[in-house]
Amino acid sequence: MCATDNAPAANAAPEKPSNVGVEVGHTGEQTNPYGANPADFLSNVSKFQLIESTLREGEQFASAFFDTETKIEIAKALDDFGVDYIELTSPAASEQSRSDCEAICKLGLKAKILTHIRCHMDDARLAVSTGVDGVDVVIGTSQFLRQYSHGKDMNYIAQSAVEVIEFVKSHGIEIRFSSEDSFRSDLVDLLNIYRTVDKIGVNRVGIADTVGCANPRQVYELVRTLKSVVSCDIECHFHNDTGCAIANAYTALEAGANLIDVSVLGIGERNGITSLGGLMARMIAADRDYVLSKYKLHKLRDLENLVADAVQVNIPFNNPITGFCAFTHKAGIHAKAILANPSTYEILNPADFGLTRYIHFANRLTGWNAIKSRVDQLNLHLTDAQCKDVTAKIKKLGDVRSLNIDDVDSIIREFHADVTSTPTVAATEGPAVEDEPAAKKAKTEE
């Protein structure tokens, strides 16, 4: 794609890189030698499901306020994208939350609708009355939460869990039981409560890294251990306080978890949870065919823009997939390789997401291969040697100031005009060669 004529300077900010780049085609199939080990029979990297929590966890984001119309718009967009479950705020949170839950349940979406409640019978009764497809029950199990939050011991937690689970099951809908603050809970307590709820028939149990303290190794060990204790599915919820949410989610799937909680842009309490787009990037690198068959990835940018507008934030420049430079290549060495085969410096194919890649050539780091590509786009003809010469001019100006695409195009066109207007003299045409004695005489007279 040719860059626009009214492009800003190359260092101007956060606009789509289409203003400063060259689109190039994708050649060759993406391959990843570091994908999931096919011999690992416990891995669910190629058969995971998403519980999308923008309308529950995302409502806990500091600047979030979703009115009913916005919630419905987001729910429809998530459903169109292809998420398996949509999780909603507890109807016990407020009267409007209950009304919104009922409204979304009536939309007839393909995704199953869940609501997230405390492990309490009052909440359970209210939840099943809204028409949801499932209920996600949670209660804190760490010493911190047992002492400073709800004040209950593990016996009380187990009894409450059994009562709520049996009630929800009696209404014929799905039920998940999750511990809160799982990674700071006593392992014996944790496994005992999971074993108890598994025996009475929960659809899945949940592990929650509520404070974002877990690392991938801890996640792998806990999920593997839990896998040997329960027969139901395992769902995982990871906060991003220490930057491990995406890595932890992927590791959980490798260890045998079945479902991951995500939100658009990762919005949620504090700095949020595993982001939908970030996890899509990680998963498509592991199993492209599965992800492409399941999710409408070309809808991701619009989905993120919708939520970003709703919570009044900008999409981060380094956001996986949709960050404004996610598929922009600047260094000359990179550009040369990308022009030959995009897989040299890309593990993701932008076309899978309805996006394009760009070669950012308006800078002093550019290489002559990138400039030659731009020359071709301008329908001009320069030899390789001439492309190298004009690249040197561009680099020289780039050492003085920031460049934009108009600067580069102007240099290229002026250079092209100069070389095409200068008569080309054949070496075999003797009369056109300057007379050597006369030339020496002229220099002597100077």
Swiss-Prot record:
GO terms for molecular function: homocitrate synthase activity; metal ion binding. One of its GO terms (biological process) is lysine biosynthetic process via aminoadipic acid. It is an enzyme of class 2 (transferase). Its cofactor is Mg(2+); Mn(2+). The active site is at H334. It catalyses: acetyl-CoA + 2-oxoglutarate + H2O = (2R)-homocitrate + CoA + H(+). Its EC number is 2.3.3.14. Residues 437-446 have a biased composition (Basic and acidic residues). Keywords: Amino-acid biosynthesis, Lysine biosynthesis, Magnesium, Manganese, Metal-binding, Mitochondrion, Transferase, Transit peptide. Its main location: mitochondrion. CDD domains: DRE_TIM_HCS. Residues 1-14 have a biased composition (Low complexity). InterPro entries: 2-IPM_HCS-like (IPR050073), AIPM/Hcit_synth_CS (IPR002034), Aldolase_TIM (IPR013785), DRE_TIM_HCS_fun_bact (IPR048253), Homocitrate_synth (IPR011872), LeuA/HCS_post-cat (IPR054691), PYR_CT (IPR000891). 2-oxoglutarate binds at R56, H116, R176, T210. Belongs to the alpha-IPM synthase/homocitrate synthase family. Homocitrate synthase LYS20/LYS21 subfamily. This is Homocitrate synthase, mitochondrial.
